[in-house]
Amino acid sequence: VASLGKALGLTGGVIASDSNFIQEIKNYDTFVAAAGMNPAYVQTLAQTGNLVQQQLKKLQDNLNYLAQHLQPNPKINFTTNYPSIYLNWDKSNEILLKNKIVITHFNYPSDQKTLNRIVISANHQKEDLDQLVQVLNSFL
């Protein structure tokens, strides 16, 4: 699944897999909507290889930094392989907002559970990550 296209300014995504996996994910609300990619955006992306590599390195550095500083917590779902942190407790959005941290916070139509997701980017500074770590580690 390639979902970083939107992070790079593209207006669509791509899923490349075998047909069994494609059929399986069609059952999930998160994968039923689609948007075609603007060819001009794709061409621009193709011409920015060096910049993309630099940003990917910064993103991976940020993810590794978080992995080193976040304390293990069953309410925090995080891996250095994916630039999002999923939070599994009801008051997380309120607490983060009080600390001036804005997250993705919504419900999918067929899911009663609220999605609380923090998206990590290459543009986050060490100070941003330190603030996030401090707040998340205080939930222990």
What are the language-model segments listed below?
Residues 19-22, 33-35, 45, 104, ...:
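Short, low-complexity, polar/charged sequence segments that are solvent-exposed and flexible
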Residues 64, 68-139:
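Conserved C-terminal alpha-helix-loop-beta "cap" of PLP-dependent enzymes
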Residues 1-71:
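Active-site C-terminal subdomain of aminotransferase-like
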